[in-house]
């Protein structure tokens, strides 16, 4: 935000809500690419100078408003070699600049929200791992859960109408509408839907999707505010660019008759919880399945009549938590019963009391993770390590550091697993794949490589957590079990590794 504040004079734009002129500022496209103007995509691909991007954007916008914006004459291609490139580049130029602009009012409201709520450590709440302590605390007391896939077919006009709450500039909204209709086919995948969380997804569409989800989840916040007369704990919504997180405590009986074609009833449920991650959401409750069914049909009517997205009720399944596993964010989570026997003696009578307690467990699913490693050529489909092809000029230290970085990132992300057996197998695959890669480069056998490198090579693959724990605890059977079940959640993880994002 400090970078935006210096460039854009946000106080003035906040008063007038007029963002259209920012499309023709050079520094907008420098911010979009996160580096200087000398290395912008406009100068790299077209050979233009530092101050040519605004001219190109003006020409693209002019052609967009014409009847045939994608038809370029032969003279234009000769005089301007930029227009001879792929048409996808044109849409990329405008979309990246547009994304920076429309995020300005969104960021301003986010900052004001955090200041109003006096949230000092909002960065910790932005971590992906911050969801799991909440699940451990709440889900062990719940009975039923629904894993909902949020519809991805979103009408273009719905996206524009959603953005009207954030941007009040009519010129920007008109340009956005033209842009979406003209370049829709070049910005989406061949399957005609948005791949929302892929690496190559345009930044603008991520923002539009998050704004759309924000409006959907604001209805939950509205219900929580309407039930303020009930005894409830404070909760709120924390906005991010990609992930949204909200916790709902109480609901009260209300009904809508404006946006829906039927009356919907909501009953008080003090144990209803909601979590969204990427394009999916989880609803969990302690009450009977009847209440979960009511929420199921509420979601169906919400998407169909308010957002005009076709949604089948059969896509929402209600399951018992004790018999169901949740696969999300690279973990497989479930609620299991842990039995413990307590021996009690009163005078001459001996009693054995069997206590069953629910515990929320998170493990690493090994089969999908091996599939990701296989696609990245670290192993075959059966999990056997293989050597990776390397460049001839790559040094041994570069190859080792690359494998170490991948191994430590995976260990860091999966540190919350209650069982480390799957994680140890992944580390074994990466370590042996590194050895085979180096042996292939030097044209020697694996045994010869181990004789030259010694045991120091294996110690490099130990993570910092394992080194610290091995120094604190003596190497006994109890300490190894403690190391095997040690769980750690980190509040600095804001993105998912490509090998983990196999969903």
Swiss-Prot record:
UniProt entry keywords in alphabetical sequence: Chloroplast, mRNA processing, Plastid, RNA-binding, tRNA processing
Family statement: Belongs to the intron maturase 2 family. MatK subfamily.
Functional summary from the UniProt entry: Usually encoded in the trnK tRNA gene intron. Probably assists in splicing its own and other chloroplast group II introns.
Gene Ontology terms: cellular component: chloroplast
InterPro entries found in the cross-reference section: Domain_X (IPR024937), Maturase_MatK (IPR002866), Maturase_MatK_N (IPR024942)
Molecular function, one GO term: RNA binding
Gene name as annotated: matK
Record's subcellular location: Plastid, Chloroplast
Domain of life: Eukaryota
Keyword Manganese in record: no
This protein's name: Maturase K
GO biological process: mRNA processing; RNA splicing; tRNA processing
